[in-house]
Amino acid sequence: MTKQIQKTVSVCIIGRPNSGKSTLLNRIIGEKLSIVTPKVQTTRSIITGIITLNDTQIILYDTPGIFEPKGTLEKAMVRCAWSSLHSADIVMLIIDSLKPLDSITHDILNKLRSLNVVPVFLLNKIDVESKYIDDTKAFLAENYSDSLLFPISAISGENVDKLLEYITSKAKIAPWLYEEDDITDLPMRFIAAEITREQLFLGLQQELPYKLTVQTEKWEELKDKSVKINQIIVVSRESYKTIILGKNGSKIKELGAKSRMQMQQFFGFPVHLFLFVKVRELWEDNSDYYEYMKI
């Protein structure tokens, strides 16, 4: 029997916050792996997505949005995004076509040039009419003629098939790094924490979601094939804890129920989820939390 020739290619997706990086990764692998919310800076670490198409395994790195960081956590997130370039065969810069090119995007372009990186441009959100798209295309064509440009819609899937054809064409003969049906190399504990953090981002107002982190403290497989999960929501102030708990614990019950449903849908087995809130002042300056968050 002839052994199948295996090919691999790795791709990192960088860009400003809320430009569509996580949505694109989820679209390509066909699963909701990377959490998505309307709030900026939802992604804090590199999320690895994997898809195997025929003889080619594609490894995708979704990264934190690049912006002007202020605090210790934000600086760590931006460093994490830039570090992904070293692991990738292809660097893709995703640009929101609904917005004009701003100073941060120009800074990203300049840094890529200083690193001698020729990115592939993804002009995202073309499913919505934009008054900026023609100017953006003209600027990129004039100043970055060596780069390819793909107008896409990560949310509708428009032109994503053409993008995949290009990515596949760049694969090199090499053994696959993962099993054929793997979609990520992230631990289930980490994914579960991300699912809960997504619900906190969606369910809490203003700045509070940025002031917390989630850790899966316990993962116990039970005899009936269900899993008991204990998670800690870490906040820096007692007032934040009060908000998350809600009146008579109503808010945390609501958030827990939504998180549990998402976990069951993703993992495919029953989940018993227990959430606890702990106050840890200045947790954002503690590197132990960064290690758990993979940044």
Swiss-Prot record:
Can you list the GO cellular component terms from the UniProt entry? cytosol; plasma membrane
Give start and end of each Era-type G domain: 7-176
> A Pfam family this protein belongs to?
KH_2
- The reply to whether Membrane figures as a keyword in the UniProt entry is yes
Which InterPro entries would you find in this protein's record? Answer: G_ERA_dom, GTP-bd, GTPase_Era-like, KH_dom-like_a/b, KH_dom_type_2, KH_sf_prok-type, P-loop_NTPase, Small_GTP-bd
Q: Where is this region: G4?
A: 124-127
- Where is GTP annotated to bind? 15-22, 62-66, 124-127
Keyword presence, Cell membrane: yes
**Job of this protein:** An essential GTPase that binds both GDP and GTP, with rapid nucleotide exchange. Plays a role in 16S rRNA processing and 30S ribosomal subunit biogenesis and possibly also in cell cycle regulation and energy metabolism.
This protein's name: GTPase Era
| Species assigned in the record | Rickettsia bellii (strain OSU 85-389)
Could you tell me the gene encoding this protein?
era
